[in-house]
């Protein structure tokens, strides 16, 4: 099992919000997602996509904790701080990215992630529901 955190979907969200890519590059990305994901699945990859959705207040709370905690400070970057100032642009980019890359053969599973424990359980439950295994029922 391989987990990708953020991965190439950044092209649709972060790169759009911060002008790290052109509109043409972003639209090309959207055009390539379906064929690429389809190719992966034809090669035996079982692709399960999750969007862990964190609300604005929780987002701020986590950033403040990272700022105060020397063991978590390394997780905080200038882009993270700027995120809150661009919340509306992020929301639009996320909605568009999820809409354009939510495909029949590889749908998104949007998980409310303000509560980390519940979010992790929801992700595990979804992953396990995708496979047959001894003792499943």
What kind of feature is each model-predicted range?
Residues 14-32, 40-92:
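A glycine- and Lys/Arg-enriched "phosphate-lid" helix/loop adjacent to the NTP-binding pocket
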Residues 3:
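Conserved phosphate-interacting/catalytic interface
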